[in-house]
């Protein structure tokens, strides 16, 4: 989503100032819409290229995003799982938080999915993301997403949350019970998770 855009802007600025070198960095993205090619302006590959990869000295061959053009969901997910196991746990994972508590495209469910899988997007997610498309009917109904188990194996997690509209769900994620109905709540069990939020997003918190 758009939550980390400000983070990417700072990373680009630090690179331009000579403070960061991305030549040895490998990135793995959380998710991609099923059916969208990397050249599609609404794809997450295009988003990452535009906001980060094409502005820094990263080796493009070391930037990985699920293959949205693979119509066979099982094949697409297996390929990404094999890649993730080969690379190993990420040193740092940057997450946003959906209005319904989803992380990546791990939507509210009756169970946590461990590995990369194909998910049917909820109406809440479709409504939240339609602003990026010409019309609501253009929003893909499915996506490939990294699983909760893979996310939890990352060594450090940063969650970026902003806005009053995220206040109630952020409260549930931090102070509510751990449940797959609020996927982000699983982060309570991560040994090194930091949440970066503005005052509006924290306005429902009891401290």
Task: List each model region and its residues.
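Class I SAM-dependent methyltransferase SAM-binding "motif I" and its flanking Rossmann-like core
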Residues: 100, 104-148
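A glycine- and small-aliphatic-rich helix-loop capping segment at beta-alpha/alpha-beta transitions
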Residues: 9-20, 44-46, 108-118, 178
């Amino acid at each position: 989503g758009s939550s980390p855009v400000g983070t990417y802007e700072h990373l680009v600025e630090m690179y331009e100032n000579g403070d960061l070198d991305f030549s040895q960095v490998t990135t793995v993205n959380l998710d991609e819409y099923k059916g969208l090619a990397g050249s599609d302006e609404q794809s997450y590959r295009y988003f990452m290229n535009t906001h980060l990869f094409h502005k820094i000295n990263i080796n493009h061959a070391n930037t990985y995003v699920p293959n949205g053009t693979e119509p066979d969901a099982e094949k697409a997910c297996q390929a990404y799982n094999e890649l993730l196991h080969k690379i190993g746990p990420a040193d740092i994972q940057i997450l946003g938080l959906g209005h319904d508590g989803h992380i990546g495209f791990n939507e509210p469910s009756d169970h946590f999915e461990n590995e990369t899988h194909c998910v049917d997007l909820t109406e809440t997610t479709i409504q939240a993301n339609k602003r990026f498309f010409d019309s609501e009917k253009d929003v893909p109904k499915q996506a490939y997403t990294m699983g909760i188990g893979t996310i939890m194996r990352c060594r450090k997690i940063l969650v970026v949350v902003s806005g009053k509209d995220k206040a109630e769900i952020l409260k549930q994620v931090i102070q509510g019970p751990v449940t797959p109905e609020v996927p982000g709540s699983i982060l309570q069990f991560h040994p090194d998770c930091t949440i970066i939020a503005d005052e509006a997003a924290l306005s429902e918190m009891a401290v």
